[in-house]
Each structure stands twice: as C-alpha cells, then as structure tokens.
A protein has these predicted regions:
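Short, low-complexity disordered leader/linker segments with a strong preference
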Residues: 1-28, 59-60
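Extracytoplasmic "Venus flytrap"
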Residues: 14-23, 30-49, 71-77, 100, ...
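Acidic-residue sensor for enzyme active/binding pockets
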Residues: 15, 56, 191
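Beta-alpha junction/loop-to-helix N-cap segments that form part of ligand/metal-binding clefts
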Residues: 17, 41-46, 60-127, 138
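Loop/turn elements at helix/coil->beta-strand transitions in domains of secreted/extracellular proteins
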Residues: 25-28, 62-67, 90-95, 113-118, ...
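An alpha-beta-alpha
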Residues: 35, 135-190
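Solvent-exposed, polar/charged alpha-helical surfaces in well-ordered, non-transmembrane soluble domains
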Residues: 44, 48-55, 78-89, 93, ...
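Signal peptide-proximal N-terminal region
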Residues: 47-68, 182, 186-188
Length: 191
C-alpha cells in the first residue's frame, strides 16, 4: 500500500522578485521511505522532517516554493521503485530519499536514466553515491560508523575483549561490522 501526503499545489503570484519571495511554479519534491513495516521509525522521522521543512520554507516565503509528496516503500526495493515511478508521474523534479539503503540503491539505478536529482538523507552504504552523478548522500557512511566506533573504544581504553552482535543479512549492520572488525585491530582488543 502506498501512503501519500501532499502540500497544497498553488502557483505563487503577485510577489515581486525584489521582495525576495519565490514567485514561480512550486518545485515538486518527492520523498520515499518506510512509513509502515519494520523500518517505519526511520521513514516516519524523515517524512516528518521533510514535511516540516517544506511548511516552514513555504511559510517564510509567503507562497509555495515547494510542493511535496511522500510515498511509503515499506523498506522494499521493488515498492520503492514503484513509488519513484508514481512520483515521476506526479511531476517530481527532485527526490529527497529514499530513506534506507536497499531501496535507495534500486531507485538510484532507475534515476540515472532520468537524470533525476536524488538526495538521500539517511541511506548509509558507501555504494549509494557510486550509482551515478545525480545521486547524493547527506549522512555518514557505514564504514564511517565502524571506524568511529573502533576509534572511540580504542581511544578510551574501554575493552580488551569485544563481542559483536550484528545482522549478517542486513547491509547496514554488515557494513558497519566489516569496517569495525578491520579497524578494531589497531587497538589491543580482540574480537
């Protein structure tokens, strides 16, 4: 199931360019993420942040700079591509998402053909930005998190023996673990 949220779709008019207000047709921004299912916590956080940002920017401008629509992908790559295509049909010009890595990789592969600007706020696999020149990543990558964790433990002498519990079937968890395992060897810790 696809859940959509949309701001009003009015064309701003009557404002002069000298006033500093945007007076053109609103820019259509799409969002994709899991707002239902196991990863809904992440998707809802991003959805709420995007919605708030659009409302605040439009309010500060006095007219609609952005139209925004968000689609639920349930953290599923195929549903994310379907959501992407639905947003393209809506007229999306910029994609703020997807939220999680696996759906982002699937959508990024599609977006290259369309030269759609894609900016994920939270998909953290290092391979996300390798899909095309149109795909950007705002957050830290999985390897960055593994390095930071290992550095923190080593710098603060927190342990000499470490056990790691991670989900080998999850790209996010595995990515952090792989880099952590490599980096923790610099310390006197044993995994």
């Amino acid at each position: 199931s696809t859940v959509s949220s949309e701001t009003s779709s009015t064309v701003a008019s009557g404002e002069s360019a000298a006033s500093g207000s945007y007076t053109g047709t609103p820019i259509k921004v799409g969002g994709i993420g899991p707002i239902t299912g196991a990863a809904a916590t992440y998707g809802n956080a991003v959805k709420n942040a995007e919605e708030l940002a659009v409302k605040e920017i439009n309010a500060a401008n006095g007219s609609d700079v952005f139209d925004w629509k968000f689609e639920d992908d349930e953290h599923d790559a195929e549903k994310s591509v379907n959501a992407y295509n639905s947003l393209k049909d809506w007229g999306m010009q910029v994609l703020a998402g997807p939220v999680t890595t696996t759906p982002t990789l699937a959508v990024a592969a599609e977006s290259v053909n369309d030269n759609m600007f894609v900016m994920t706020p939270s998909a953290s696999a290092q391979t996300v930005i390798e899909t095309g020149d149109n795909v950007f990543q705002i957050c830290f990558t999985d390897p960055n998190q593994g390095v930071a964790s290992a550095d923190y433990i080593a710098e603060n002498a927190l342990a000499t023996k470490i056990g790691v519990i991670y989900d080998s079937s999850d790209a996010y968890s595995s990515g952090i673990y792989a880099k952590f395992k490599t980096e923790i060897g610099r310390a006197s810790c044993r995994e």
